[in-house]
Amino acid sequence: MASRMLPLFLCACCALGLSSGDGSSSLILPKEVHFRTLRQLTFGGQNAEGYFSTDETKLIFQSTRDSLQCDQEFVMDLASGSVRMISTGRGRTTCGYFFPGDTLVLFSSTHHLMSNCPPRPDFSKGYTWAVTPEYDIFTARPDGSNLHRMTTTPGYDAEATISPRGDRIVFTSMRNGDLDLYTMNLDGTGVRQLTHELGYDGGAFYSWDGSMIVYRACHYEDSASASVYRQLLSQNLVRPLHMEIFVMNADGSHRRQITFNGAANFAPFFHPDNRRIIFASNVADPQGRDFDLYLINIDGSGLERVTYNETFDGFPMFTHDGRKLVFASNRNGKVPHETNLFLADWRE
């Protein structure tokens, strides 16, 4: 996000125009049969990774808006539409998530090591993501107070989410020289490495019963691609063109790959039945630019396309009863590539 200080409170009905997000069907595209209604929650800027509080009355999300130059963390009250920035306004943030009970949130931030936004990736090397080494994981109250740094190891620590059991945090770290998944206790102790294959393991979420973890990964077995990966990683970059979805037990055992399509598959999240996973993929677009949501069984069978937007749909999360789904989308944007949050009433 940008190094600027927004007013802490934004009136969503004024600044975000929530009065037009009436939960109608006008935003639902043909073939999107799982959406009963669809309501737009944000209007303008870049808004993504919206995740419910455990009581499902609020969302935490990252946004670049107004005078911001890169993402900060915000909390939205779904009943009133009010939005509050809870991060410092310095550096850049990512990957916010509520603790069980909603007394705390976590997110990753660079503010303690840099006031300005981190440099953008150099696309002369092709399409890449930055794995900014200044990222550490922080906790705070949902109003942004009591900010506390949780990770202190050198290198990238981000992409953290919490088990519904309320006992462990899963996150991605480069502390051992590669991008692997780790878990830790809610106070940051008891760190344990779960993945060890060369490549980028990230974007992990627990199943609703806390027994499994779903994540996306790109692994490199041939020497040429491994060499390119290592070279980019030495510059704090990754090339996320081919990522597959994996599931494992919460202790890291019984890892299995469930997609094999060679596309960019990411943002997986468990359906409340713990037997299916919703995720984003560009598998249907030969050019690789159109991302839609898909459902798949945890054994890799039963792939079903959920959205049919021609640009981007991603970062889905269900409520615990499976009746609502929040996700980010480029649909209905006023300018190209604008990304907003949407809330769907879900039907099977």
Task: Indicate where each model-derived feature is located.
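Blade/loop signatures of beta-propeller domains
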Residues: 22-36, 135
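Predominantly a core beta-strand signature of beta-propeller blades
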Residues: 37-40, 81-84, 127, 134, ...
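Hydrophobic beta-strand positions that form the internal "hydrophobic ladder"
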Residues: 59-60, 105, 169, 213, ...
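Residue-level detector of Asp-centered blade-edge/turn motifs that repeat once per structural unit
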Residues: 54-55, 100-101, 164-165, 208-209, ...
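Short loop/turn segments that connect beta-strands within beta-propeller blades
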Residues: 77-81, 141-145, 185-189, 249-253, ...
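A flexible loop/linker signature enriched in serine peptidases of the S9 family
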Residues: 43-46, 63-73, 88-93, 108-137, ...
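Beta-strand-rich domains and repeat architectures in extracellular enzymes and scaffolds
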Residues: 26, 37-69
